[in-house]
């Protein structure tokens, strides 16, 4: 639990200035982050496993096909679009047995059996041709090594997790919550995005034809849209957009804001 709390707090602090709008929300999140940092760090130091500094790469066998990825517990996932499926774990030698990779019901689950702190690296490299859903939680981070293309893709980040992806997608759906962050680049025809509980989604460099955005509870969304834009912001959340959409429907209440950042 310690490393999860630390990752959550660090990510919230990193995105703090971007998404805090209301004074009440600001005070609440300050207190929450302080609690997470104090208890998270102490718990992590007591219960976590420290890396031995000897980094090795372990090639893992993939027993079954998968179309989804679910990663957690502070691990860093690097995804490469490739016709050749492969899986490698790059981490301190004494941490290798703690990092588990298992395919169940079409989902590749990547996690750790114990808290990890002070590691030289804890990377999991995944190569696959087709992925339609990516979930990251509990301080995990996912990166695309090259442009990832798909007809449809769902990205879900929660509990201080991060997603940094370069995409070409027909139907893209993204959801961020609980202090998570996303940074997206590329193109999408249809883009549905929602953020809550202090999460931050930056898609200024992702050009969407049509976009439906919903932000609440001190979260922040940035998008670029060219055709149809529907936006709703509530409870101190903010939505900023670029791209001069031809049709825009904007709704805001309880301290929420929807603003164009272009003249």
Each model region followed by its residue ranges:
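Short acidic/polar N-terminal linker immediately downstream of export determinants
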Residues: 2, 26-36, 42-96, 109, ...
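Short, Lys/Arg-enriched N-terminal segments with co-localized hydrophobic residues
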Residues: 3-24
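Short, solvent-exposed coil/turn segments at beta-strand boundaries
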Residues: 104-106, 130-131
């Amino acid at each position: 639990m310690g490393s999860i709390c630390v990752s959550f707090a660090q990510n919230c602090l990193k995105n703090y200035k971007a998404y805090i709008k209301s004074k009440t929300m600001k005070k609440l999140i300050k207190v929450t982050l302080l609690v997470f940092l104090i208890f998270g760090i102490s718990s992590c130091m007591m219960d976590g496993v420290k890396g031995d500094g000897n980094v090795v790469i372990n090639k893992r066998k993939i027993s079954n096909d998968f179309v989804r990825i679910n990663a957690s517990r502070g691990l860093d996932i690097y995804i490469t679009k490739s016709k050749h499926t492969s899986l490698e774990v790059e981490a301190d030698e004494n941490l290798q047995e703690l990092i588990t990779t298992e395919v169940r019901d079409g989902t590749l689950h990547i996690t750790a059996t114990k808290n990890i702190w002070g590691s030289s690296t804890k990377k999991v490299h995944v190569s696959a041709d087709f992925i339609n859903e990516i979930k990251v939680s509990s301080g995990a981070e996912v990166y695309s090594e090259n442009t990832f293309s798909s007809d449809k893709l769902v990205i879900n980040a929660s509990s201080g997790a991060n997603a940094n992806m370069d995409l070409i997608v027909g139907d893209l759906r993204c959801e961020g919550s609980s202090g998570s962050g996303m940074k997206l680049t590329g193109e999408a025809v249809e883009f549905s995005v929602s953020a809550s509980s202090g999460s931050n989604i930056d898609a200024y460099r992702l050009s969407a034809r049509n976009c439906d955005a919903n932000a609440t509870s001190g979260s922040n969304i940035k998008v670029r849209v060219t055709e149809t834009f529907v936006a709703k912001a509530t409870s101190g959340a903010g939505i900023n957009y670029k791209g001069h959409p031809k049709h825009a429907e904007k709704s805001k209440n309880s301290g929420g804001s929807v603003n164009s950042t272009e003249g």
